[in-house]
């Protein structure tokens, strides 16, 4: 059992360069995509990712906000899955909060690019795997 869930999982999450994010398609099937690490996180409850407004994933989250994110430490073969919902944010404050230098590579019109938005993932439950065992938890 984890002694300090937020510290243990936060440390795992912060050391991964890639995260996996899943949505549900119109046929009810999961769709998983590798993404860069979240731009910002608030504990293990809320995570912010940048993406293109025109992406397939944004359309899926608007139709069905159920989502899952996964972080894996392949060196020690441990990982955490968080289940929750995604909200697509397009307001100026949310976009500015996670904007980074170099983002014009993806969003050439800058922070106000209409094809730039923020995915805010809010976790409800999770499952942590380490040392050949799993632990379910509530966030």
Identify what each model region corresponds to.
Residues 27-30, 76-78, 129:
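Short glycine/serine/proline-enriched coil/turn segments at secondary-structure junctions
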Residues 16-18, 45-47, 64-67, 114-116, ...:
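Short, surface-exposed beta-edge/turn micro-motifs
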Residues 38-76:
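A short mixed-secondary-structure module that forms the rim of ligand-binding clefts
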Residues 11-26, 67-71:
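A short, Trp-centered hydrophobic/proline-enriched beta-strand micro-motif
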Residues 19-49:
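N-terminal leader/targeting helix
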Residues 3, 16-21, 100-103:
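Short Pro/Gly-enriched beta-strand edge/turn motifs at strand-loop
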Residues 81-139:
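Charged, gly/pro-rich active-site loop segments
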Residues 1-7, 51-57, 103-104:
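Charged, amphipathic alpha-helical segments
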């Amino acid at each position: 059992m984890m002694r300090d869930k937020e510290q243990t999982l936060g440390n795992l999450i912060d050391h991964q360069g890639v995260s996996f994010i899943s949505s549900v398609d119109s046929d009810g099937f999961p769709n998983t995509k590798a993404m860069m690490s979240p731009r910002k996180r608030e504990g293990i409850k809320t995570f912010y990712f940048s993406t293109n407004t025109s992406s397939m994933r944004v359309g899926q989250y608007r139709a069905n906000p159920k989502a899952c994110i996964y972080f894996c430490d392949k060196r020690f073969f441990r990982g955490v899955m968080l289940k929750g919902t995604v909200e697509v944010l397009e307001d100026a404050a949310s976009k500015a909060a996670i904007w980074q230098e170099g983002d014009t590579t993806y969003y050439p019109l800058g922070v106000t690019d209409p094809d730039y938005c923020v995915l805010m993932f809010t976790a409800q439950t999770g499952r942590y795997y380490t040392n050949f065992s799993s632990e379910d938890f509530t966030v």
